[in-house]
């Protein structure tokens, strides 16, 4: 079956997480992604957080499925020759180097356009143009500078980063959308273009409801936040609001049966207005249906702590799955707190390809996330990540059309192998 991005060839200069997230998505949709790696070492994540000695880490394997790997010393003249040929052949170049690295390699935007005017050059940086553009950024730095940390956690506690990789993987998702948009525009213009995504920008985009609330503060307190009901004044910036819902409909994480032993025996419950009377029935507070202090959403806002404490009395008598079954029967929005162990063992996620089992030649079988985006006419088959330089000869021959003699010449030049260490005299 033809894949959505069949015929698109991507030159992948990315490393660690943000860039590989982007290029893995493109590969899942059928693009031929050629990962260019440093001879002898490759992507640094091959050796980071290793759980099995001398085997590519899960950090690497889970971010580089469906790709091909070529090792190339881009400082070597023959290596530069190969890279130039790849730029001429590929549709997209993706990189998440520090600012200016690609230029110092001799491949400025102008040079790349000279080689291939149809080339799309996509870049992830920590910050956009401005006072911080030369600063190094990692996941948690992006969360802290993009508005996530200042609005995550509890009011009297430290700012917190989230377990979701919204800085790295989130920006990779944004860049992938930018790339396919640029590819579509190229059909009309015939020209390539630059696509950039800054990690700070990506995090802020995902925190848009907090920017919404920042402006609402100019007109009064945020009444759906817990501190309103507690009578605590608001400052001039959006506060941390614990587990309060950010969507305008009050919600909290509540204890369930077994919470004393199980750190994940909790459920999230939302007191949505259309199902308020059903909530009252479930928890045995039928008198609240018509009581002026509880009957309307505005009346309930100052009493949310009391209301959720009462709902929690009920949820503590049920397991999180029992509570979910009862609440869902009445269309009451809720969701159990699922551990990674529970998710890994969820057969429904296996059936949809959201979690997949992959077989690797040195690691063996392991679990990975699959493509979260499902296309009816372009299903994703998750294939293992490449070994370092596994496809070097294949790419030189099949993509660039080099003869056996030319391939041997490239190898003999040292362009595909780590530099030899000279013995001390």
UniProtKB/Swiss-Prot annotation:
Keywords in alphabetical order: Transferase
Residues annotated for substrate binding in this entry: 247-249
Positions annotated to bind CoA: 17-18, 38, 72-75, 96-98, 104, 136-139
Catalysed reactions, semicolon-separated: formyl-CoA + oxalate = oxalyl-CoA + formate
Biological process terms in GO annotation: oxalate catabolic process
GO molecular function, one term: formyl-CoA transferase activity
Active site positions: 168 (nucleophile)
A Pfam match: CoA_transf_3
Gene3D superfamilies: Crotonobetainyl-coa:carnitine coa-transferase, domain 1, formyl-coa transferase, domain 3
Pathway info: Metabolic intermediate degradation; oxalate degradation; CO(2) and formate from oxalate: step 1/2
InterPro entries found in the cross-reference section: CoA-transferase_III_domain, CoA-Trfase_fam_III, CoA-Trfase_III_dom3_sf, CoA-Trfase_III_dom_1_sf, Formyl_CoA_transfer
E.C. number(s) listed in UniProt: 2.8.3.16
Function: Involved in the catabolism of oxalate and in the adapatation to low pH via the induction of the oxalate-dependent acid tolerance response (ATR). Catalyzes the transfer of the CoA moiety from formyl-CoA to oxalate.
Family from the record: Belongs to the CoA-transferase III family. Frc subfamily.
Record's subunit section: Homodimer.
Protein name in UniProt: Formyl-CoA:oxalate CoA-transferase
